[in-house]
A protein has these predicted regions:
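Asp-box/BNR beta-propeller blade signature and adjacent active/binding-site loops
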Residues: 37, 42-392
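Low-complexity, intrinsically disordered flanking regions
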Residues: 1-55
Length: 392
Protein backbone atom coordinates (compact mmCIF):
# COMPACT_ATOMS: atom_id res chain seq x y z
CA UNK A 1 0.00 0.00 0.00
CA UNK A 2 1.34 3.44 -0.85
CA UNK A 3 2.06 5.95 1.89
CA UNK A 4 -0.61 8.31 0.58
CA UNK A 5 -3.26 5.59 0.51
CA UNK A 6 -2.30 4.43 3.97
CA UNK A 7 -2.53 7.96 5.37
CA UNK A 8 -5.96 8.51 3.86
CA UNK A 9 -7.31 5.28 5.31
CA UNK A 10 -5.78 5.42 8.76
CA UNK A 11 -4.80 8.86 10.03
CA UNK A 12 -8.33 9.98 10.90
CA UNK A 13 -9.03 6.74 12.72
CA UNK A 14 -5.76 6.99 14.63
CA UNK A 15 -6.51 10.50 15.82
CA UNK A 16 -9.86 9.40 17.26
CA UNK A 17 -8.54 6.17 18.76
CA UNK A 18 -5.61 7.74 20.60
CA UNK A 19 -7.08 11.09 21.62
CA UNK A 20 -7.93 9.84 25.12
CA UNK A 21 -4.69 7.93 25.62
CA UNK A 22 -1.57 9.13 27.39
CA UNK A 23 1.18 10.75 25.38
CA UNK A 24 2.61 7.47 24.02
CA UNK A 25 0.59 4.58 22.64
CA UNK A 26 1.70 1.51 20.72
CA UNK A 27 -0.29 0.41 17.70
CA UNK A 28 0.05 -2.61 15.48
CA UNK A 29 -1.04 -1.52 12.02
CA UNK A 30 0.40 -2.36 8.63
CA UNK A 31 2.65 -0.09 6.68
CA UNK A 32 4.80 2.86 7.62
CA UNK A 33 2.82 3.67 10.76
CA UNK A 34 2.94 0.18 12.31
CA UNK A 35 5.32 1.03 15.15
CA UNK A 36 4.33 3.90 17.44
CA UNK A 37 2.10 6.95 17.55
CA UNK A 38 3.11 9.88 19.74
CA UNK A 39 0.49 12.23 21.18
CA UNK A 40 2.05 15.53 22.20
CA UNK A 41 -0.99 17.19 23.79
CA UNK A 42 -0.28 18.81 27.13
CA UNK A 43 3.46 18.18 27.20
CA UNK A 44 5.82 20.51 28.99
CA UNK A 45 8.12 22.58 26.83
CA UNK A 46 11.83 21.86 26.94
CA UNK A 47 14.71 23.83 25.54
CA UNK A 48 16.31 22.41 22.42
CA UNK A 49 19.88 21.27 22.91
CA UNK A 50 21.78 21.43 19.65
CA UNK A 51 24.40 18.79 18.97
CA UNK A 52 27.74 20.53 18.75
CA UNK A 53 29.01 21.36 15.30
CA UNK A 54 32.42 21.81 16.95
CA UNK A 55 32.83 18.13 17.84
CA UNK A 56 36.24 17.02 16.61
CA UNK A 57 36.12 13.73 14.75
CA UNK A 58 39.13 11.56 13.84
CA UNK A 59 37.95 11.48 10.26
CA UNK A 60 35.63 13.01 7.69
CA UNK A 61 32.32 11.34 6.81
CA UNK A 62 30.82 11.59 3.33
CA UNK A 63 27.28 10.59 2.36
CA UNK A 64 27.51 9.24 -1.18
CA UNK A 65 24.96 9.88 -3.93
CA UNK A 66 24.63 6.19 -4.83
CA UNK A 67 21.10 5.25 -3.77
CA UNK A 68 19.94 1.78 -4.78
CA UNK A 69 16.99 -0.53 -4.14
CA UNK A 70 17.18 -3.44 -1.72
CA UNK A 71 15.02 -5.89 -3.69
CA UNK A 72 13.96 -6.81 -7.21
CA UNK A 73 11.81 -4.31 -9.14
CA UNK A 74 9.36 -2.81 -8.38
CA UNK A 75 11.20 -2.74 -5.01
CA UNK A 76 8.41 -2.39 -2.47
CA UNK A 77 8.45 -3.06 1.25
CA UNK A 78 9.21 -1.38 4.57
CA UNK A 79 11.39 -1.76 7.70
CA UNK A 80 14.59 -2.63 5.76
CA UNK A 81 17.52 -4.29 7.54
CA UNK A 82 20.80 -5.86 6.38
CA UNK A 83 22.83 -8.93 7.34
CA UNK A 84 26.35 -9.77 6.13
CA UNK A 85 27.10 -13.50 5.81
CA UNK A 86 30.49 -15.15 6.30
CA UNK A 87 30.74 -15.91 2.56
CA UNK A 88 30.42 -12.21 1.70
CA UNK A 89 26.76 -12.36 0.69
CA UNK A 90 24.52 -9.57 2.00
CA UNK A 91 20.87 -10.26 2.79
CA UNK A 92 18.27 -7.51 3.00
CA UNK A 93 15.01 -8.02 4.87
CA UNK A 94 11.74 -6.11 4.75
CA UNK A 95 7.97 -6.39 5.19
CA UNK A 96 5.51 -6.52 2.30
CA UNK A 97 1.71 -6.52 2.32
CA UNK A 98 0.35 -8.91 -0.36
CA UNK A 99 -3.40 -9.50 -0.54
CA UNK A 100 -4.12 -8.07 2.89
CA UNK A 101 -1.48 -10.22 4.54
CA UNK A 102 2.03 -9.53 5.79
CA UNK A 103 5.03 -11.17 4.19
CA UNK A 104 8.53 -11.06 5.68
CA UNK A 105 10.87 -11.20 2.71
CA UNK A 106 14.59 -11.57 2.05
CA UNK A 107 16.63 -10.35 -0.93
CA UNK A 108 20.23 -11.23 -1.73
CA UNK A 109 23.30 -9.33 -2.95
CA UNK A 110 26.48 -10.99 -4.20
CA UNK A 111 28.19 -7.74 -5.30
CA UNK A 112 28.76 -6.12 -1.89
CA UNK A 113 25.38 -4.44 -1.77
CA UNK A 114 25.32 -2.80 -5.19
CA UNK A 115 22.29 -4.80 -6.36
CA UNK A 116 19.74 -7.06 -4.67
CA UNK A 117 17.41 -9.75 -6.01
CA UNK A 118 14.41 -11.24 -4.22
CA UNK A 119 15.50 -14.50 -2.63
CA UNK A 120 13.07 -15.99 -0.10
CA UNK A 121 10.10 -15.55 2.21
CA UNK A 122 10.53 -16.23 5.94
CA UNK A 123 6.83 -16.24 6.80
CA UNK A 124 3.45 -14.91 5.72
CA UNK A 125 0.50 -14.26 8.03
CA UNK A 126 -2.76 -12.41 8.43
CA UNK A 127 -1.67 -11.30 11.91
CA UNK A 128 0.78 -8.61 12.89
CA UNK A 129 4.21 -9.83 11.75
CA UNK A 130 6.87 -7.16 11.27
CA UNK A 131 10.20 -5.83 12.62
CA UNK A 132 12.28 -8.65 11.12
CA UNK A 133 16.00 -8.77 11.94
CA UNK A 134 18.50 -11.29 10.51
CA UNK A 135 21.69 -12.58 12.15
CA UNK A 136 24.14 -15.24 10.96
CA UNK A 137 25.01 -17.45 13.95
CA UNK A 138 27.26 -19.97 12.12
CA UNK A 139 28.40 -20.21 8.49
CA UNK A 140 25.21 -20.57 6.43
CA UNK A 141 22.97 -20.67 9.53
CA UNK A 142 20.84 -17.55 9.92
CA UNK A 143 18.21 -16.59 12.45
CA UNK A 144 15.27 -14.32 11.65
CA UNK A 145 13.60 -12.70 14.67
CA UNK A 146 10.39 -10.73 14.31
CA UNK A 147 7.30 -9.60 16.16
CA UNK A 148 4.41 -12.02 15.67
CA UNK A 149 1.21 -10.82 17.31
CA UNK A 150 -2.23 -12.38 17.14
CA UNK A 151 -4.90 -9.79 16.44
CA UNK A 152 -8.54 -9.64 17.48
CA UNK A 153 -11.30 -7.13 16.77
CA UNK A 154 -10.12 -4.94 19.67
CA UNK A 155 -6.38 -5.22 19.18
CA UNK A 156 -3.62 -7.73 20.00
CA UNK A 157 -4.61 -10.94 21.79
CA UNK A 158 -1.11 -12.41 22.16
CA UNK A 159 2.41 -10.97 21.80
CA UNK A 160 5.44 -12.92 20.56
CA UNK A 161 9.00 -12.49 19.38
CA UNK A 162 9.30 -15.46 17.01
CA UNK A 163 12.55 -16.89 15.67
CA UNK A 164 12.91 -18.83 12.41
CA UNK A 165 16.09 -20.51 11.18
CA UNK A 166 17.73 -21.15 7.82
CA UNK A 167 20.64 -23.57 7.41
CA UNK A 168 21.17 -22.97 3.68
CA UNK A 169 22.16 -19.31 3.59
CA UNK A 170 18.65 -17.88 3.82
CA UNK A 171 16.78 -19.73 1.07
CA UNK A 172 14.56 -22.04 3.17
CA UNK A 173 13.21 -21.10 6.60
CA UNK A 174 11.71 -23.14 9.42
CA UNK A 175 10.27 -22.23 12.81
CA UNK A 176 12.89 -22.40 15.58
CA UNK A 177 11.39 -20.97 18.77
CA UNK A 178 9.51 -18.25 20.58
CA UNK A 179 12.21 -16.06 22.10
CA UNK A 180 9.60 -14.26 24.20
CA UNK A 181 5.82 -14.12 24.46
CA UNK A 182 3.18 -12.64 26.73
CA UNK A 183 -0.46 -11.74 27.00
CA UNK A 184 -1.93 -8.24 26.52
CA UNK A 185 -2.30 -5.45 27.29
CA UNK A 186 1.43 -4.64 27.52
CA UNK A 187 3.40 -5.65 24.45
CA UNK A 188 6.81 -6.62 23.07
CA UNK A 189 8.42 -5.39 19.84
CA UNK A 190 11.50 -4.68 17.75
CA UNK A 191 14.07 -7.50 18.09
CA UNK A 192 17.77 -6.94 17.50
CA UNK A 193 20.35 -9.76 17.49
CA UNK A 194 24.12 -10.06 17.78
CA UNK A 195 26.56 -12.89 18.52
CA UNK A 196 28.47 -12.54 21.79
CA UNK A 197 32.11 -13.32 22.52
CA UNK A 198 31.33 -16.91 23.55
CA UNK A 199 29.26 -17.59 20.43
CA UNK A 200 25.93 -17.14 22.19
CA UNK A 201 23.08 -15.34 20.43
CA UNK A 202 21.95 -12.19 22.23
CA UNK A 203 18.43 -11.08 21.30
CA UNK A 204 17.29 -7.66 22.50
CA UNK A 205 13.69 -6.44 22.31
CA UNK A 206 11.38 -3.74 23.69
CA UNK A 207 8.84 -4.56 26.39
CA UNK A 208 6.14 -2.38 27.90
CA UNK A 209 5.85 -2.28 31.69
CA UNK A 210 3.33 0.58 31.84
CA UNK A 211 1.84 3.14 29.49
CA UNK A 212 4.79 5.42 30.26
CA UNK A 213 7.49 2.78 30.76
CA UNK A 214 9.10 0.60 28.11
CA UNK A 215 12.47 -1.12 28.52
CA UNK A 216 15.07 -3.00 26.53
CA UNK A 217 15.10 -6.71 27.37
CA UNK A 218 17.70 -9.42 26.69
CA UNK A 219 17.32 -13.15 26.09
CA UNK A 220 20.25 -15.44 25.26
CA UNK A 221 20.46 -18.67 23.23
CA UNK A 222 23.39 -21.09 23.32
CA UNK A 223 21.89 -23.55 20.83
CA UNK A 224 21.52 -21.32 17.76
CA UNK A 225 18.03 -20.12 18.59
CA UNK A 226 16.29 -23.32 19.72
CA UNK A 227 15.93 -22.23 23.37
CA UNK A 228 16.28 -18.93 25.20
CA UNK A 229 16.91 -17.70 28.72
CA UNK A 230 14.22 -15.83 30.63
CA UNK A 231 14.07 -12.13 29.68
CA UNK A 232 16.22 -9.72 31.66
CA UNK A 233 15.54 -5.98 31.82
CA UNK A 234 18.79 -4.18 31.00
CA UNK A 235 17.96 -0.70 32.25
CA UNK A 236 15.17 1.63 33.30
CA UNK A 237 12.53 -0.72 34.69
CA UNK A 238 11.44 2.01 37.13
CA UNK A 239 11.92 5.00 34.84
CA UNK A 240 8.92 6.81 33.29
CA UNK A 241 10.53 6.57 29.85
CA UNK A 242 9.66 4.55 26.76
CA UNK A 243 13.01 3.22 25.56
CA UNK A 244 12.78 1.18 22.37
CA UNK A 245 14.04 0.19 18.91
CA UNK A 246 17.62 -0.46 20.02
CA UNK A 247 20.68 -1.06 17.87
CA UNK A 248 24.19 -2.03 19.01
CA UNK A 249 27.70 -1.60 17.60
CA UNK A 250 31.17 -2.60 18.81
CA UNK A 251 33.76 0.06 19.58
CA UNK A 252 36.69 0.70 21.94
CA UNK A 253 37.36 2.90 24.96
CA UNK A 254 41.09 3.44 25.54
CA UNK A 255 41.79 0.07 23.94
CA UNK A 256 39.07 -1.71 25.91
CA UNK A 257 36.29 -3.33 23.90
CA UNK A 258 32.89 -1.71 24.40
CA UNK A 259 29.38 -1.96 23.01
CA UNK A 260 27.29 1.12 22.36
CA UNK A 261 23.50 0.76 22.28
CA UNK A 262 21.32 3.48 20.75
CA UNK A 263 17.56 3.69 21.26
CA UNK A 264 14.65 6.09 21.11
CA UNK A 265 13.21 7.44 24.34
CA UNK A 266 10.71 9.99 25.67
CA UNK A 267 12.69 12.08 28.16
CA UNK A 268 11.32 15.34 26.72
CA UNK A 269 7.86 14.09 25.71
CA UNK A 270 8.47 13.65 21.98
CA UNK A 271 11.03 11.06 20.95
CA UNK A 272 14.77 11.67 21.13
CA UNK A 273 17.78 9.37 20.81
CA UNK A 274 19.98 8.27 23.71
CA UNK A 275 22.67 5.64 24.24
CA UNK A 276 24.20 3.27 26.78
CA UNK A 277 27.62 1.64 27.00
CA UNK A 278 28.58 -1.89 28.03
CA UNK A 279 32.09 -3.06 28.89
CA UNK A 280 31.15 -6.70 29.56
CA UNK A 281 29.78 -7.80 26.17
CA UNK A 282 26.22 -6.70 26.87
CA UNK A 283 25.69 -8.17 30.35
CA UNK A 284 25.36 -4.76 32.04
CA UNK A 285 24.83 -1.26 30.70
CA UNK A 286 25.46 2.26 31.95
CA UNK A 287 26.94 5.66 31.03
CA UNK A 288 23.62 6.80 29.58
CA UNK A 289 23.88 9.89 27.43
CA UNK A 290 22.09 11.88 24.72
CA UNK A 291 22.83 11.18 21.07
CA UNK A 292 20.40 13.56 19.39
CA UNK A 293 17.53 15.77 20.53
CA UNK A 294 15.49 17.52 17.82
CA UNK A 295 14.18 21.03 18.16
CA UNK A 296 11.42 21.63 20.68
CA UNK A 297 8.19 19.72 20.08
CA UNK A 298 9.67 17.50 17.36
CA UNK A 299 10.76 13.86 17.26
CA UNK A 300 13.80 11.73 16.51
CA UNK A 301 13.51 7.96 16.78
CA UNK A 302 14.04 4.50 15.34
CA UNK A 303 17.86 4.66 15.58
CA UNK A 304 20.43 2.10 14.46
CA UNK A 305 24.22 2.18 14.70
CA UNK A 306 27.33 0.86 12.94
CA UNK A 307 31.04 1.36 13.58
CA UNK A 308 34.08 1.85 11.38
CA UNK A 309 37.45 0.10 11.73
CA UNK A 310 38.88 2.82 13.98
CA UNK A 311 35.95 2.55 16.41
CA UNK A 312 34.23 5.71 15.19
CA UNK A 313 30.46 5.33 14.96
CA UNK A 314 27.52 6.39 12.81
CA UNK A 315 24.01 6.53 14.29
CA UNK A 316 21.15 6.79 11.82
CA UNK A 317 17.61 7.81 12.80
CA UNK A 318 14.40 9.34 11.49
CA UNK A 319 13.27 12.82 12.54
CA UNK A 320 10.54 15.34 11.78
CA UNK A 321 12.57 18.30 13.03
CA UNK A 322 12.56 19.94 9.58
CA UNK A 323 8.77 19.81 9.26
CA UNK A 324 6.52 22.63 10.42
CA UNK A 325 3.73 20.15 11.13
CA UNK A 326 4.26 17.47 13.79
CA UNK A 327 2.27 14.27 13.28
CA UNK A 328 4.79 11.55 14.04
CA UNK A 329 5.79 9.47 12.17
CA UNK A 330 4.67 11.47 9.16
CA UNK A 331 7.03 14.02 7.58
CA UNK A 332 10.15 12.22 8.81
CA UNK A 333 13.52 12.39 7.08
CA UNK A 334 16.57 10.20 7.69
CA UNK A 335 19.69 11.71 9.27
CA UNK A 336 22.99 10.48 10.68
CA UNK A 337 25.34 11.68 13.42
CA UNK A 338 28.94 10.60 14.03
CA UNK A 339 31.18 10.12 17.04
CA UNK A 340 34.70 8.99 17.79
CA UNK A 341 35.47 6.21 20.25
CA UNK A 342 34.23 6.64 23.82
CA UNK A 343 36.73 8.08 26.28
CA UNK A 344 36.16 6.82 29.83
CA UNK A 345 32.46 6.40 29.09
CA UNK A 346 32.01 9.79 27.44
CA UNK A 347 30.88 10.14 23.83
CA UNK A 348 30.43 13.34 21.81
CA UNK A 349 28.14 13.27 18.79
CA UNK A 350 28.30 15.53 15.74
CA UNK A 351 25.55 17.62 14.23
CA UNK A 352 23.23 15.65 11.89
CA UNK A 353 23.70 15.09 8.17
CA UNK A 354 20.74 14.38 5.88
CA UNK A 355 20.56 10.92 4.32
CA UNK A 356 17.05 10.86 2.80
CA UNK A 357 14.39 13.60 2.67
CA UNK A 358 10.82 13.36 3.88
CA UNK A 359 8.96 11.19 3.86
CA UNK A 360 11.38 8.41 4.83
CA UNK A 361 11.04 5.80 7.54
CA UNK A 362 12.57 2.98 9.66
CA UNK A 363 16.31 3.34 8.97
CA UNK A 364 18.97 0.67 9.39
CA UNK A 365 22.74 0.56 8.94
CA UNK A 366 25.47 -2.04 8.43
CA UNK A 367 29.24 -1.93 7.97
CA UNK A 368 30.36 -2.88 4.46
CA UNK A 369 34.10 -2.75 5.15
CA UNK A 370 36.58 -0.80 7.28
CA UNK A 371 35.55 2.61 5.95
CA UNK A 372 32.06 2.23 4.44
CA UNK A 373 28.61 1.59 5.86
CA UNK A 374 25.34 0.98 4.01
CA UNK A 375 22.43 3.04 5.34
CA UNK A 376 18.91 1.75 4.68
CA UNK A 377 15.46 3.34 4.84
CA UNK A 378 11.97 3.15 3.35
CA UNK A 379 11.03 5.96 0.96
CA UNK A 380 8.35 4.41 -1.20
CA UNK A 381 10.27 1.13 -0.95
CA UNK A 382 13.44 -0.23 0.70
CA UNK A 383 16.46 1.86 -0.34
CA UNK A 384 20.09 2.27 0.66
CA UNK A 385 23.14 4.46 0.10
CA UNK A 386 26.71 4.31 1.33
CA UNK A 387 28.51 6.52 3.83
CA UNK A 388 32.30 6.65 3.59
CA UNK A 389 34.59 7.42 6.53
CA UNK A 390 37.84 9.14 5.56
CA UNK A 391 40.23 8.75 8.53
CA UNK A 392 42.23 11.81 9.48
Amino acid sequence: MSLRAFEQQNVAALQVKFLSHSQISNITMPGHFGQKVLKTLGLNDHAHQQNSSAVRLPGRPAVNNDERGLSSPPNNGTYPRLCRLSDGTILSSFTRFPDGQRSLRVAKSTDNGLTFEDFSEVTRAAGDVDNMFLCEVAPGTILAAFRNHDMGPNGPTHFRITVCRSTDGGRVWQFASQAAEKRPPLGIWEPFMRVGRQGEVQLYFSQEFAHNNQCTMLVVSRDQGSTWTQPTCLHGDQDPLRDGMCGIARTFDNGREALLMVFETTRYGPFSVEALLSYDDGATWGWRHEVFRPRQGHNAGSPQIASFADGSMATIFMTDEDSNHVEWVKNASIKVVFASQPVEGRVQWSSPTLISPASSFWPGIMALDHHNVLATYDRGGPLAKTITWHPA
